[in-house]
Design a protein with these regions (language model features):
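Bacterial N-terminal signal peptides
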Residues: 9-18
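Auxiliary, metal-adjacent structural segments of Zn-dependent hydrolase domains
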Residues: 24-153
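Surface-exposed patches in mature extracellular/periplasmic domains of secreted proteins
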Residues: 96-107, 184-186, 215-227
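Active-site recognition of the HExxH zinc-binding catalytic motif
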Residues: 163-183
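Post-HEXXH active-site segment of zinc metalloproteases
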Residues: 178-202
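Long, well-structured alpha-helical subdomains associated
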Residues: 193-197, 213-315, 323
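An active-site-proximal "capping" alpha-helix that borders the catalytic cofactor pocket
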Residues: 197-213
Length: 323
């Protein structure tokens, strides 16, 4: 038991210790050839589940525990505000992820299966093994009731249950990570294994922080530290397992203790990073240095933003309203 506790502490420290330290220029992604005219540009699709009083009430009750440890009342609220939708849409558009379907409080197993079949990015073998397992989880334990915000790389869809921009952009960052891989099916499947899955969470959180800093969006950066860090701490404490899965192999009291410990560790790290960044921001304000600490020093011939992919012009950096 003592050995397991030390291993858990080591995993938590190594995972959380790598966050909040981004210093390289933020890289916007480019995965498609740029449209020749604004009319040809693909826009982000949002699909919404239909209201159901009884189902929505049950979902709200089931989600109560999940709102406690991340210290945010809008986690698994099964609602998406216009402001949050616009922030998510801007991230997806800025990183050329307009092919990602956003499902807001929606349950559509038939549609998910069809999208998985049509997803040419993922190899056949991965789609009908790991992809099918993911589809079964979506079908039998629907986020429409049990909550959860997650990107499914096999169907290329993002399921949304929370009204928290930091959480949604972190999951969207995983979509960016998947799109940038030469072997996305292999990468996605490997990252489903316990412990290994922490790697993709860490990369996504760091991308979210880098994006927030480049956009000079202190509210988003602060929310990432305050809300996503505790959630990542829980993941690290569970070793990347789900709480349900661990209950089957560990004493039932061990799982909640691990979750609380991970959340407290994540909260502590998050508040430490917030305090450090607030000090930096105040110092920069007094000396008129840009808030974005990750901005590279460039000359007239260089762009301040690094891009991944085809185009050379950085995407629009001002949030756009949804049509």
């Amino acid at each position: 038991m003592a050995r397991r506790s030390w291993l858990m502490i080591l995993v938590i420290n190594s995972t959380l210790g790598s966050l909040g330290c981004a210093t390289t220029p933020y890289k916007y992604s480019r995965f498609h050839v740029e449209a020749s005219s604004p009319e040809e540009r693909q826009t982000v699709q949002f699909e919404y589940g239909k209201p159901h009083r009884g189902l929505d009430r049950a979902a709200w009750i089931v989600a109560l525990p999940s709102r406690i440890l991340p210290f945010h009342p809008k986690v698994n609220s099964h609602n998406l505000s216009q402001e949050t939708a616009e922030k998510l849409e801007h991230y997806l558009e800025a990183n050329d992820l307009t092919d990602v379907l956003v499902r807001v409080n929606q349950y559509d197993p038939v549609g998910e299966w069809q999208r998985m079949r049509e997803n040419s990015r993922i190899a056949f073998g991965w789609k009908y093994t790991f992809g099918t397992a993911n589809w079964l989880g979506y079908t039998l334990i629907p986020s429409r009731v049990f909550g959860g915000d997650y990107y499914n790389p096999y169907s290329n869809s993002l399921s949304v249950s929370s009204d928290v921009p930091a959480i949604l952009i972190t999951e969207a960052a995983y979509a960016k990570d998947i799109h940038s891989q030469a072997l996305p099916g292999t990468y996605a499947s490997i990252n489903q294994f316990p412990v290994l899955t922490l790697w993709r969470y860490t990369r996504a959180v760091n991308d979210s922080l880098g994006y927030a800093r480049h956009q000079d969006d202190w509210e988003l950066e602060r929310e990432t530290c305050a809300t996503v860090f505790p959630m990542l701490g829980i993941q690290a404490a569970l070793g990347g397992h789900t709480a349900t899965g661990l209950v089957m192999v560990l004493p039932s009291i061990t799982v909640p203790i691990a979750m609380i410990g991970g959340a407290v560790a994540g909260h502590t790290v998050g508040q430490t990073v917030i305090a450090k960044r607030e000090h930096e921001i105040e110092s920069r304000k007094s000396t008129r240095i840009p808030l974005n600490s990750s901005e590279a020093e460039t000359d007239d011939s260089e762009s301040k933003t690094q891009l991944v992919g085809f185009t050379e012009s950085p995407p629009d950096e001002k949030p756009k309203g949804r049509p």
